[in-house]
Regions:
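Beta-rich nucleic-acid/ligand-interaction surfaces
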Residues: 129-148
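Long, amphipathic alpha-helical coupling/dimerization segments that relay conformational signals between
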Residues: 95-132
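N-terminal accessory segment detector
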Residues: 1-89, 95-107, 139-141, 150-151
Length: 151
């Protein structure tokens, strides 16, 4: 039985891209190990962020609004930000990462990670690091933490 994520993906991913994305992911996985794939997707995310800069934001609320406007413009879900004291929690919902196939969920979220890192660096948070908090089970919700890098 299809999951909610499967249904949403089916509705929002053009059929012309499904086979290509899965074949691309399979070929990437055949040529690169998991860490290399994460590094590649992180760099792709950085490039995406550089090509789609955010406006200056003076608050967490303004940042969330800018991020959500950016993701909504390409139908890539939405984000929630929460100040947890020693880190900023970033939860991204509804990115079409499952389009690459279930096995790719181990490395495709690095695209989001690289995007968030680049945007936050551009806003002056270059002394902080975006890290992924676990591997998403279904790819619908991906959590990241923005915090000081640990040695």
């Amino acid at each position: 039985m299809p999951t909610v994520v499967d249904v949403l993906l089916e509705q929002h991913l053009s059929p012309q891209w499904r086979g290509l994305l899965r074949a691309l992911a399979a070929e990437f996985a055949a040529q690169l190990d998991r860490e290399e794939l994460r590094q590649l997707m992180f760099r792709v995310g950085e490039r995406f962020a550089a090509e789609h800069p955010l406006p200056a934001c003076e608050s967490t609320e303004a940042l969330a609004a800018a991020l959500n406007a950016r993701w909504a413009s390409i139908q890539w879900g939405c984000v929630e930000l929460a100040d947890e004291g020693d880190y900023l929690r970033i939860v991204h919902y509804g990115a079409p990462l499952p389009a690459f196939g279930g096995d790719a969920l181990a490395w495709t979220p690095a695209f989001l990670q690289g995007s968030y890192q680049a945007w936050l660096d551009a806003m002056g948070a270059s002394d902080l690091t975006v890290v992924q908090a676990g591997v998403p089970e279904d790819g619908y919700a991906v959590e990241f933490h923005l915090a000081r890098a640990t040695a």
